């Protein structure tokens, strides 16, 4: 099964078994807010179609800042709509669920997650 994992934000992290990186969806001067949505749709489409992705996994929106949660929710909606149109399965996980699965504790700090990834995946530069 080919999986595309997304950490959705204005700078969206993505990973598959073959590639990973960050998509910068930041608006340029004079662009409408909808350009973020268009950029993300284009990037997701490109990866899904070129790598024959079967499942898209995303982190659920969370945080303290309402505007960031709204932006993340809009971006996630774009991904869900694309997946529905193309009949691609998708799922969402909270940060706590991801941390608990990966480290056994749902409240690990990001630095601890990185250390665990380095420990597990020695063949990859992290």
Give the ranges of each region predicted by the language model.
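Phosphate- and other anionic-substrate recognition elements at nucleic-acid/protein interfaces
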Residues: 1-126
